[in-house]
Amino acid sequence: MNTIRVKKMHPDAMLPTYGSADAAGADLYACIQEPVTIQPGEVFWVPTGIALEVPKGCAGLVYARSSMGAKRGLAPANKVGVVDSDYRGEIRVVLLNHSNQPQTLQPGERVAQFVITPVLQPMYEEVEELSDTGRGAGGFGSTGK
């Protein structure tokens, strides 16, 4: 088992937890002192109160919790947040209220999930031509699916 080093930036912060033994993402918690209401179309930067060390060669991805998006219309404004392995600041979740109703966050509420994944960092080479494929430049429905 791997271990991620976590630093509490606030005494009320909660460390990430997994909802089940096989969960891919660990829940991130709102480190707020009182309820916060996010109006429709509004963005709120949710502090988690933690900083952590993503292993070198990996990235931490911040995804919406399915229940937050499906039931309440709250999801990360940038769709997926990327935490690089050399970042040591507080993890914050930029939530956007996509619904037409105000949504209230409670202190300690689970607001996102955090997935650690390996990353490649290839070199980019400029070329005159790319290799041929059956698909070519077809996209956005070109495969008939």
Give the residues covered by each predicted segment:
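DUTPase catalytic domain/fold
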Residues: 1-145
